[in-house]
Design a protein with these regions (language model features):
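Alpha-helical recognition segments enriched in aromatics with Gly/Pro capping
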Residues: 1-32, 49, 99, 104, ...
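N-terminal, positively charged nucleic-acid-binding surface of large information/translation enzymes
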Residues: 10-13, 19-105, 430-439
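Structural preference for alpha-helix termini/caps and helix-kink/transition segments
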Residues: 267-442
Length: 442
Protein backbone atom coordinates (compact mmCIF):
# COMPACT_ATOMS: atom_id res chain seq x y z
CA UNK A 1 0.00 0.00 0.00
CA UNK A 2 1.21 3.51 -0.85
CA UNK A 3 1.16 6.30 1.73
CA UNK A 4 -1.89 8.50 1.26
CA UNK A 5 -2.04 11.98 2.76
CA UNK A 6 -5.04 14.29 2.95
CA UNK A 7 -4.15 17.38 0.93
CA UNK A 8 -5.93 20.52 2.16
CA UNK A 9 -5.42 22.07 -1.29
CA UNK A 10 -7.45 19.38 -3.10
CA UNK A 11 -9.58 18.29 -0.13
CA UNK A 12 -8.89 14.63 -0.74
CA UNK A 13 -6.48 11.86 0.15
CA UNK A 14 -3.74 11.53 -2.42
CA UNK A 15 -1.00 9.00 -3.03
CA UNK A 16 2.19 10.59 -1.75
CA UNK A 17 4.79 10.94 -4.46
CA UNK A 18 7.81 13.13 -3.69
CA UNK A 19 9.33 15.39 -6.32
CA UNK A 20 12.64 13.57 -6.05
CA UNK A 21 12.47 9.79 -5.68
CA UNK A 22 13.04 8.56 -2.10
CA UNK A 23 13.70 12.11 -0.87
CA UNK A 24 11.24 14.36 1.00
CA UNK A 25 11.53 18.09 1.68
CA UNK A 26 9.14 19.23 4.40
CA UNK A 27 8.50 22.57 6.08
CA UNK A 28 6.32 23.04 9.16
CA UNK A 29 5.47 26.40 10.70
CA UNK A 30 7.15 26.47 14.09
CA UNK A 31 6.25 28.37 17.24
CA UNK A 32 6.15 32.07 17.95
CA UNK A 33 8.31 32.18 21.07
CA UNK A 34 6.45 34.84 23.03
CA UNK A 35 5.63 32.35 25.79
CA UNK A 36 6.16 28.76 26.96
CA UNK A 37 4.63 25.97 24.81
CA UNK A 38 1.08 24.73 25.38
CA UNK A 39 -0.89 21.59 24.52
CA UNK A 40 -1.73 22.96 21.06
CA UNK A 41 2.00 23.19 20.33
CA UNK A 42 2.41 19.63 21.63
CA UNK A 43 -0.21 18.28 19.26
CA UNK A 44 1.32 19.94 16.20
CA UNK A 45 4.86 18.96 17.15
CA UNK A 46 3.92 15.31 17.77
CA UNK A 47 1.83 15.12 14.57
CA UNK A 48 4.67 16.18 12.31
CA UNK A 49 7.27 14.27 14.31
CA UNK A 50 5.19 11.13 13.63
CA UNK A 51 4.94 12.01 9.92
CA UNK A 52 8.68 12.64 9.70
CA UNK A 53 9.55 9.39 11.48
CA UNK A 54 7.07 7.35 9.46
CA UNK A 55 8.49 8.73 6.20
CA UNK A 56 11.95 7.65 7.36
CA UNK A 57 10.56 4.27 8.44
CA UNK A 58 9.12 3.93 4.92
CA UNK A 59 12.55 4.40 3.37
CA UNK A 60 12.58 8.11 2.52
CA UNK A 61 15.39 10.54 3.22
CA UNK A 62 13.75 13.51 4.92
CA UNK A 63 14.93 17.10 5.15
CA UNK A 64 12.72 18.58 7.84
CA UNK A 65 12.64 22.34 8.37
CA UNK A 66 10.65 24.06 11.10
CA UNK A 67 11.16 27.74 11.82
CA UNK A 68 11.19 29.86 14.95
CA UNK A 69 9.27 33.14 14.82
CA UNK A 70 11.38 35.41 17.02
CA UNK A 71 10.07 38.77 15.79
CA UNK A 72 6.34 39.49 15.72
CA UNK A 73 3.71 41.71 17.35
CA UNK A 74 2.97 39.20 20.14
CA UNK A 75 6.66 39.07 21.04
CA UNK A 76 7.05 42.85 21.06
CA UNK A 77 3.93 43.26 23.22
CA UNK A 78 5.03 40.54 25.65
CA UNK A 79 8.49 42.10 26.02
CA UNK A 80 6.90 45.49 26.75
CA UNK A 81 4.53 43.90 29.27
CA UNK A 82 7.39 42.22 31.13
CA UNK A 83 9.89 45.03 30.65
CA UNK A 84 12.28 42.48 29.16
CA UNK A 85 14.72 42.64 26.27
CA UNK A 86 13.21 40.94 23.19
CA UNK A 87 16.26 38.79 22.52
CA UNK A 88 16.36 37.55 26.12
CA UNK A 89 12.62 36.85 26.06
CA UNK A 90 12.78 34.83 22.84
CA UNK A 91 15.89 32.90 23.86
CA UNK A 92 14.36 31.99 27.21
CA UNK A 93 11.10 30.82 25.65
CA UNK A 94 12.86 28.97 22.82
CA UNK A 95 14.83 27.03 25.43
CA UNK A 96 11.53 26.07 27.11
CA UNK A 97 10.04 24.95 23.78
CA UNK A 98 13.00 22.75 22.89
CA UNK A 99 13.21 21.20 26.37
CA UNK A 100 9.49 20.45 26.53
CA UNK A 101 9.34 19.04 22.99
CA UNK A 102 12.19 16.69 23.85
CA UNK A 103 10.24 15.39 26.85
CA UNK A 104 7.31 14.41 24.60
CA UNK A 105 9.57 12.50 22.22
CA UNK A 106 9.88 15.13 19.48
CA UNK A 107 13.22 15.28 17.63
CA UNK A 108 14.77 18.61 16.68
CA UNK A 109 14.31 19.64 13.02
CA UNK A 110 17.20 19.17 10.59
CA UNK A 111 17.12 22.94 10.11
CA UNK A 112 15.50 25.36 12.56
CA UNK A 113 15.84 28.88 11.13
CA UNK A 114 15.04 31.96 13.17
CA UNK A 115 13.13 34.68 11.34
CA UNK A 116 15.62 37.36 12.42
CA UNK A 117 18.42 35.47 10.63
CA UNK A 118 16.69 35.69 7.23
CA UNK A 119 15.61 39.34 6.97
CA UNK A 120 17.78 39.96 3.82
CA UNK A 121 15.95 37.08 2.07
CA UNK A 122 12.61 38.57 3.12
CA UNK A 123 13.56 41.97 1.73
CA UNK A 124 14.66 40.33 -1.53
CA UNK A 125 11.32 38.51 -1.83
CA UNK A 126 9.36 41.73 -1.25
CA UNK A 127 11.49 43.49 -3.91
CA UNK A 128 10.62 40.76 -6.43
CA UNK A 129 6.92 41.15 -5.63
CA UNK A 130 7.25 44.93 -5.99
CA UNK A 131 8.92 44.58 -9.40
CA UNK A 132 5.99 42.43 -10.56
CA UNK A 133 3.39 44.93 -9.37
CA UNK A 134 1.94 43.03 -6.41
CA UNK A 135 2.67 45.64 -3.73
CA UNK A 136 1.69 49.13 -2.63
CA UNK A 137 2.69 51.41 0.24
CA UNK A 138 0.47 52.85 2.93
CA UNK A 139 2.08 55.96 4.39
CA UNK A 140 3.29 55.64 8.00
CA UNK A 141 2.19 52.00 7.98
CA UNK A 142 4.00 49.64 5.64
CA UNK A 143 4.31 47.78 2.34
CA UNK A 144 1.21 45.72 1.51
CA UNK A 145 0.38 42.83 -0.83
CA UNK A 146 -2.53 43.45 -3.21
CA UNK A 147 -4.47 40.15 -3.17
CA UNK A 148 -6.61 41.19 -6.16
CA UNK A 149 -3.48 40.83 -8.35
CA UNK A 150 -3.16 37.10 -7.52
CA UNK A 151 -5.89 35.29 -9.43
CA UNK A 152 -5.73 32.11 -7.33
CA UNK A 153 -6.07 33.83 -3.96
CA UNK A 154 -8.33 31.69 -1.77
CA UNK A 155 -7.50 28.34 -3.41
CA UNK A 156 -6.08 26.72 -0.26
CA UNK A 157 -8.93 27.79 2.03
CA UNK A 158 -11.46 27.17 -0.79
CA UNK A 159 -12.86 30.69 -0.73
CA UNK A 160 -13.88 32.73 -3.75
CA UNK A 161 -11.36 35.41 -4.67
CA UNK A 162 -14.11 37.99 -5.23
CA UNK A 163 -15.34 37.49 -1.65
CA UNK A 164 -11.87 38.13 -0.30
CA UNK A 165 -11.13 41.33 -2.19
CA UNK A 166 -14.32 43.24 -1.31
CA UNK A 167 -14.01 46.03 1.26
CA UNK A 168 -17.12 45.17 3.28
CA UNK A 169 -15.21 44.00 6.33
CA UNK A 170 -15.92 46.09 9.43
CA UNK A 171 -12.87 47.95 10.76
CA UNK A 172 -10.86 47.30 7.59
CA UNK A 173 -8.06 49.84 7.20
CA UNK A 174 -9.36 52.63 4.97
CA UNK A 175 -6.11 52.80 3.03
CA UNK A 176 -6.12 49.10 2.15
CA UNK A 177 -7.25 48.32 -1.38
CA UNK A 178 -8.84 45.00 -0.40
CA UNK A 179 -10.00 43.66 2.95
CA UNK A 180 -7.52 40.74 2.94
CA UNK A 181 -4.47 42.69 1.76
CA UNK A 182 -1.67 41.93 4.20
CA UNK A 183 1.49 43.64 5.33
CA UNK A 184 4.86 42.57 3.91
CA UNK A 185 7.00 45.19 5.64
CA UNK A 186 6.01 47.22 8.70
CA UNK A 187 7.53 50.67 9.09
CA UNK A 188 9.38 51.09 12.36
CA UNK A 189 7.81 52.51 15.50
CA UNK A 190 9.65 53.95 18.51
CA UNK A 191 11.30 51.36 20.75
CA UNK A 192 10.72 48.49 18.32
CA UNK A 193 13.32 46.39 16.45
CA UNK A 194 14.06 47.52 12.91
CA UNK A 195 16.17 46.75 9.84
CA UNK A 196 17.14 48.97 6.91
CA UNK A 197 15.26 48.35 3.68
CA UNK A 198 14.54 50.08 0.33
CA UNK A 199 11.28 51.34 1.90
CA UNK A 200 12.87 52.66 5.07
CA UNK A 201 13.49 51.25 8.51
CA UNK A 202 11.10 48.53 9.60
CA UNK A 203 10.55 44.82 10.14
CA UNK A 204 9.03 41.96 8.14
CA UNK A 205 5.39 40.93 8.31
CA UNK A 206 4.65 37.45 9.66
CA UNK A 207 3.61 35.81 6.38
CA UNK A 208 6.71 36.80 4.41
CA UNK A 209 8.95 35.10 6.96
CA UNK A 210 7.95 31.51 6.13
CA UNK A 211 7.88 32.12 2.37
CA UNK A 212 11.43 33.48 2.40
CA UNK A 213 12.91 30.85 4.72
CA UNK A 214 11.33 27.84 2.99
CA UNK A 215 12.44 29.07 -0.46
CA UNK A 216 16.00 29.72 0.70
CA UNK A 217 16.45 26.41 2.53
CA UNK A 218 14.37 23.96 0.46
CA UNK A 219 13.88 25.58 -2.93
CA UNK A 220 10.58 25.55 -4.84
CA UNK A 221 8.50 23.57 -5.19
CA UNK A 222 8.91 21.33 -2.16
CA UNK A 223 6.91 18.32 -1.06
CA UNK A 224 5.05 18.97 2.20
CA UNK A 225 4.04 22.08 4.11
CA UNK A 226 2.42 21.56 7.50
CA UNK A 227 0.86 23.39 10.40
CA UNK A 228 -2.31 23.69 12.45
CA UNK A 229 -5.70 24.15 10.77
CA UNK A 230 -5.82 27.67 12.21
CA UNK A 231 -2.96 28.58 9.84
CA UNK A 232 -4.79 27.63 6.62
CA UNK A 233 -6.19 31.15 6.35
CA UNK A 234 -4.72 33.64 6.21
CA UNK A 235 -1.14 32.51 6.92
CA UNK A 236 -0.71 29.64 4.46
CA UNK A 237 -2.99 31.26 1.89
CA UNK A 238 -0.76 34.33 2.01
CA UNK A 239 2.40 32.25 1.74
CA UNK A 240 1.09 30.76 -1.52
CA UNK A 241 0.20 34.21 -2.84
CA UNK A 242 3.68 35.57 -2.07
CA UNK A 243 5.78 32.61 -3.20
CA UNK A 244 3.93 31.72 -6.39
CA UNK A 245 3.63 35.35 -7.48
CA UNK A 246 7.34 36.00 -6.92
CA UNK A 247 8.68 32.81 -8.53
CA UNK A 248 6.04 31.79 -11.10
CA UNK A 249 6.43 28.29 -9.65
CA UNK A 250 4.15 26.02 -7.68
CA UNK A 251 4.95 26.52 -4.00
CA UNK A 252 4.08 23.18 -2.36
CA UNK A 253 2.61 19.85 -3.50
CA UNK A 254 0.97 18.59 -0.28
CA UNK A 255 -0.60 20.74 2.42
CA UNK A 256 -1.06 18.85 5.71
CA UNK A 257 -2.89 20.39 8.68
CA UNK A 258 -3.58 19.08 12.17
CA UNK A 259 -6.79 19.70 14.14
CA UNK A 260 -7.21 21.96 17.13
CA UNK A 261 -7.23 21.17 20.86
CA UNK A 262 -10.35 21.89 22.92
CA UNK A 263 -10.45 21.89 26.71
CA UNK A 264 -13.68 20.44 28.14
CA UNK A 265 -15.29 20.97 24.70
CA UNK A 266 -14.27 24.65 24.59
CA UNK A 267 -11.44 25.98 22.42
CA UNK A 268 -8.27 26.34 24.45
CA UNK A 269 -7.31 29.99 24.95
CA UNK A 270 -5.54 32.18 27.48
CA UNK A 271 -8.51 34.57 27.71
CA UNK A 272 -10.81 31.78 28.91
CA UNK A 273 -8.32 30.60 31.50
CA UNK A 274 -8.34 27.04 30.16
CA UNK A 275 -4.81 27.28 28.84
CA UNK A 276 -2.66 24.18 29.49
CA UNK A 277 1.12 24.44 29.15
CA UNK A 278 3.23 21.36 28.45
CA UNK A 279 5.28 22.23 31.52
CA UNK A 280 2.23 22.14 33.80
CA UNK A 281 1.12 18.79 32.37
CA UNK A 282 4.59 17.32 32.83
CA UNK A 283 4.27 17.87 36.58
CA UNK A 284 1.61 15.14 36.72
CA UNK A 285 2.15 13.09 33.56
CA UNK A 286 5.09 11.47 31.81
CA UNK A 287 5.88 13.06 28.45
CA UNK A 288 5.13 9.77 26.69
CA UNK A 289 1.62 9.80 28.19
CA UNK A 290 1.04 13.15 26.44
CA UNK A 291 2.38 11.60 23.22
CA UNK A 292 0.11 8.55 23.67
CA UNK A 293 -2.85 10.90 24.26
CA UNK A 294 -2.13 12.78 21.02
CA UNK A 295 -1.71 9.72 18.79
CA UNK A 296 -4.89 8.16 20.20
CA UNK A 297 -6.84 10.58 17.97
CA UNK A 298 -6.56 11.10 14.22
CA UNK A 299 -4.40 14.15 13.55
CA UNK A 300 -7.03 15.98 11.47
CA UNK A 301 -9.84 15.70 14.02
CA UNK A 302 -10.27 18.10 16.94
CA UNK A 303 -9.19 16.54 20.23
CA UNK A 304 -10.89 17.28 23.53
CA UNK A 305 -8.59 17.59 26.50
CA UNK A 306 -9.71 17.16 30.09
CA UNK A 307 -8.12 15.68 33.18
CA UNK A 308 -10.18 12.53 32.69
CA UNK A 309 -9.10 12.04 29.05
CA UNK A 310 -5.45 12.42 30.00
CA UNK A 311 -5.93 10.09 32.98
CA UNK A 312 -7.48 7.54 30.59
CA UNK A 313 -4.44 7.87 28.32
CA UNK A 314 -2.14 7.41 31.32
CA UNK A 315 -3.94 4.25 32.42
CA UNK A 316 -3.92 2.79 28.89
CA UNK A 317 -0.26 3.63 28.38
CA UNK A 318 0.79 2.08 31.69
CA UNK A 319 -1.27 -1.07 31.01
CA UNK A 320 0.39 -1.39 27.62
CA UNK A 321 3.86 -0.98 29.12
CA UNK A 322 3.10 -3.54 31.82
CA UNK A 323 1.94 -6.12 29.28
CA UNK A 324 5.02 -5.52 27.14
CA UNK A 325 7.37 -5.76 30.13
CA UNK A 326 6.26 -9.38 30.61
CA UNK A 327 6.96 -10.39 27.00
CA UNK A 328 9.99 -12.49 26.16
CA UNK A 329 12.58 -10.73 24.03
CA UNK A 330 12.89 -11.96 20.46
CA UNK A 331 14.40 -10.61 17.26
CA UNK A 332 11.74 -12.02 14.97
CA UNK A 333 9.25 -9.62 13.34
CA UNK A 334 5.60 -10.59 12.92
CA UNK A 335 5.02 -9.64 9.28
CA UNK A 336 1.22 -9.92 9.60
CA UNK A 337 0.96 -7.34 12.36
CA UNK A 338 3.65 -5.10 10.89
CA UNK A 339 1.69 -5.01 7.61
CA UNK A 340 -1.47 -4.07 9.51
CA UNK A 341 0.46 -1.27 11.23
CA UNK A 342 1.79 -0.02 7.88
CA UNK A 343 -1.66 -0.20 6.27
CA UNK A 344 -3.11 1.95 9.06
CA UNK A 345 -0.31 4.51 8.86
CA UNK A 346 -0.43 4.57 5.06
CA UNK A 347 -4.09 5.60 5.34
CA UNK A 348 -3.40 9.27 6.11
CA UNK A 349 -1.45 8.52 9.30
CA UNK A 350 -4.32 6.72 11.03
CA UNK A 351 -2.52 6.52 14.38
CA UNK A 352 -5.55 5.41 16.47
CA UNK A 353 -6.01 2.43 14.15
CA UNK A 354 -2.26 1.72 14.23
CA UNK A 355 -2.39 1.88 18.03
CA UNK A 356 -5.24 -0.65 17.98
CA UNK A 357 -3.01 -2.96 15.90
CA UNK A 358 -0.33 -2.69 18.58
CA UNK A 359 -2.83 -3.60 21.29
CA UNK A 360 -4.09 -6.54 19.21
CA UNK A 361 -0.50 -7.77 18.80
CA UNK A 362 0.35 -7.73 22.51
CA UNK A 363 -2.94 -9.45 23.42
CA UNK A 364 -2.58 -12.20 20.80
CA UNK A 365 -1.47 -15.27 22.77
CA UNK A 366 -0.42 -17.12 19.62
CA UNK A 367 1.50 -14.29 17.95
CA UNK A 368 5.25 -14.66 17.59
CA UNK A 369 7.83 -11.91 17.18
CA UNK A 370 6.05 -9.46 19.47
CA UNK A 371 9.11 -7.60 20.79
CA UNK A 372 10.72 -7.51 17.33
CA UNK A 373 7.54 -5.99 15.88
CA UNK A 374 7.18 -3.48 18.71
CA UNK A 375 10.77 -2.35 18.03
CA UNK A 376 9.75 -1.58 14.43
CA UNK A 377 6.58 0.27 15.48
CA UNK A 378 8.58 2.28 18.01
CA UNK A 379 10.68 3.77 15.20
CA UNK A 380 7.57 5.85 14.44
CA UNK A 381 5.63 6.04 17.72
CA UNK A 382 8.62 6.46 20.09
CA UNK A 383 6.55 5.79 23.20
CA UNK A 384 9.45 4.24 25.16
CA UNK A 385 7.44 1.02 25.38
CA UNK A 386 10.56 -1.11 25.74
CA UNK A 387 12.37 1.17 28.13
CA UNK A 388 12.68 -0.35 31.59
CA UNK A 389 11.60 2.08 34.26
CA UNK A 390 13.57 2.20 37.48
CA UNK A 391 11.04 2.39 40.29
CA UNK A 392 11.76 3.64 43.75
CA UNK A 393 10.29 1.12 46.21
CA UNK A 394 9.69 2.45 49.75
CA UNK A 395 11.55 0.68 52.58
CA UNK A 396 8.23 -0.48 54.12
CA UNK A 397 7.22 -2.17 50.85
CA UNK A 398 10.67 -3.75 50.47
CA UNK A 399 10.24 -5.29 53.93
CA UNK A 400 6.84 -6.72 52.93
CA UNK A 401 8.35 -8.18 49.74
CA UNK A 402 11.16 -9.80 51.73
CA UNK A 403 8.69 -11.22 54.30
CA UNK A 404 6.58 -12.62 51.47
CA UNK A 405 9.63 -14.30 49.93
CA UNK A 406 10.33 -15.98 53.29
CA UNK A 407 6.70 -17.15 53.58
CA UNK A 408 6.88 -18.61 50.07
CA UNK A 409 10.06 -20.51 50.97
CA UNK A 410 8.26 -21.90 54.03
CA UNK A 411 5.26 -22.70 51.78
CA UNK A 412 3.03 -20.58 54.00
CA UNK A 413 0.82 -19.63 51.07
CA UNK A 414 -1.93 -18.02 53.14
CA UNK A 415 0.43 -15.54 54.77
CA UNK A 416 2.18 -14.96 51.41
CA UNK A 417 -1.20 -14.01 49.90
CA UNK A 418 -1.93 -11.66 52.81
CA UNK A 419 1.41 -9.95 52.24
CA UNK A 420 0.69 -9.69 48.50
CA UNK A 421 -2.57 -7.85 49.29
CA UNK A 422 -0.72 -5.46 51.63
CA UNK A 423 1.88 -4.78 48.91
CA UNK A 424 -0.89 -4.11 46.36
CA UNK A 425 -2.66 -1.81 48.81
CA UNK A 426 0.61 0.18 49.01
CA UNK A 427 0.46 0.63 45.22
CA UNK A 428 2.73 -2.15 43.94
CA UNK A 429 2.11 -5.48 42.21
CA UNK A 430 4.22 -8.63 42.53
CA UNK A 431 4.59 -11.24 39.83
CA UNK A 432 6.30 -14.55 40.58
CA UNK A 433 8.27 -15.70 37.52
CA UNK A 434 10.90 -18.34 36.78
CA UNK A 435 13.45 -15.50 36.94
CA UNK A 436 12.28 -14.41 40.39
CA UNK A 437 9.73 -11.96 41.77
CA UNK A 438 9.06 -8.86 39.65
CA UNK A 439 7.68 -5.73 41.31
CA UNK A 440 5.78 -3.01 39.42
CA UNK A 441 4.09 0.22 40.42
CA UNK A 442 0.34 -0.07 39.94
Amino acid sequence: MTLKLYNTLTRKKENFKPIKKNSVRMYVCGPTVNDVPHLGHARQQITFDILRKYLKFSGFEVKFVSNITDIEDKIINKAKELGEDIKKLTERNLKSHLEDYGKIGVDKPDVQPKATEYVPEMIDLIKRLEQKGYTYVIKNDGVYYDVSKFKDYGKLSHQKTEDLISLKKVNAKEDKKNKEDFVLWKFSKPNEPWWDSPWGKGRPGWHIECSAMSEKILGLPFDIHGGGQDLIFPHHEDEIAQSEAATDKKFVNYWVHNGMVNVDNVKMSKSLGNFKTIRDLLKDYDGRVIRYFVISSHYRKPVDFSKSTLDDAKNSYERLKNIISDLKDDKEVNTKYLKEFRDSMDDDLNTPEALAVLWKLVRDKDAKGKIGTIKEIEKTFELDLLKEEKIEIPIEVKKLIKEREEMRKKKNWEEADNLRRRIEKAGYSVDDTSEGTKVKKI
